[in-house]
Amino acid sequence: MSNTLSATVNSTNQRMGYRAHVPGREPLLLDYVPPFGDDNGFTPLELILVALATCTGSGVGILLRKKNKTVSHIEVTAQGDRAETHPTVFRTIDLHLTITSPDVVPEEMESVLRTAETTVCPVYVMLAASVEIRVGFTLKNS
């Protein structure tokens, strides 16, 4: 993978609609909620939550499987609390991972999460520099 990533967005209307293009990928629609937009796509802040959840979940999954753990399902929910005035940045983000596995124990999960948060997930590392991220997990036996 190249060290340089790129994305281009083009407006789709006279309001806040955009179509995002990343080379080799399907386009993605972005928009804002009324009154500024038409609510026809993800908002940029929603995509930040999606990126964080995906990056963290992927990192945890890779690390657990490297430890020869059986992981049948990973669900990550992300919820961000925004500032009330502009810029309406995230003040805090809560991540919750639900790992379905017959052989992952809480101590391993805590260790894997620390590694994912500090080494494996670049989205987490970038966001944690400016946002408090609180992480929890649930282990489900499969």
Where do the model's predicted regions map?
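Extended beta-strand/beta-hairpin segments
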Residues: 1-50, 61-142
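Alpha-helical metal-binding/catalytic segments enriched in His/Glu/Asp
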Residues: 55-56
